[in-house]
């Protein structure tokens, strides 16, 4: 079952997306098995990431293999909110 992942990164700004792009994480994500979509942006106090994956396991495999190894020393991964996708509307 497809899942939605929402991650909130306090104190992070729009530079996060550029850094992820430069590190190649976004290209790796697009090629990852089970990846469906990604949207993200800065709010007044954090950077919010919303992704859709074919399964929780697909997201976890990608996150553990591509994001966790790149976290700076002393930075721990946040626990995202995840829920099963029940409706996805796209243009015809």
Report the location of each language-model feature.
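Short S/T/G/P-rich N-terminal loop/turn motif that feeds into the first structured element of a domain
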Residues: 1-50, 54-69, 75-92
């Amino acid at each position: 079952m497809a899942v939605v992942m929402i991650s909130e990164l306090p104190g992070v700004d729009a530079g996060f997306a550029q850094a992820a792009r430069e590190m190649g994480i976004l290209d790796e994500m697009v090629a990852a098995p089970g990846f469906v979509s990604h949207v993200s942006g800065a709010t007044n106090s954090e950077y919010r990431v919303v992704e859709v994956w074919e399964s929780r396991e697909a997201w976890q495999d990608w996150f553990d293999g591509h994001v966790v190894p790149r976290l700076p020393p002393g930075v721990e991964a946040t626990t995202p909110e995840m829920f099963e996708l029940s409706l996805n509307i796209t243009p015809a």
